[in-house]
Amino acid sequence: MTDVLVVVKVFPESDEVNLDNLYEEIGKKLPAGYKLVRKETEPIAYGLKALIAYVQMPENVEGGTDTLEEIINSIQGVSHAEVVGITRLGF
């Protein structure tokens, strides 16, 4: 079994949410077998930025990326999270 790299765009509730702290909180909530690989920010509007999180996770997980979205959406300070990309790692 191989892993996939999932790109998740995380929209904060406001511009007062610290994206570095949000990234750390996501890392704490991830189940075993998942890991944060990298982060970026993307301007949205009026000074608000989205967090782009790259998450490595097992390919054959029940619920797929829906479970990952649910975990991130449950974190305080997150308005909405959505998967914007996925790619298979290895062969």
UniProtKB/Swiss-Prot annotation:
Entry-linked SUPFAM superfamilies: eEF-1beta-like
GO molecular function terms noted in the UniProt entry: translation elongation factor activity
Database matches in Pfam families: EF1_GNE
Record keyword Nucleus present: no
Keywords: Elongation factor, Protein biosynthesis
Domain of life per record: Archaea
Biological role: Promotes the exchange of GDP for GTP in EF-1-alpha/GDP, thus allowing the regeneration of EF-1-alpha/GTP that could then be used to form the ternary complex EF-1-alpha/GTP/AAtRNA.
Family: Belongs to the EF-1-beta/EF-1-delta family.
PANTHER family: ELONGATION FACTOR 1-BETA
Protein name: Elongation factor 1-beta
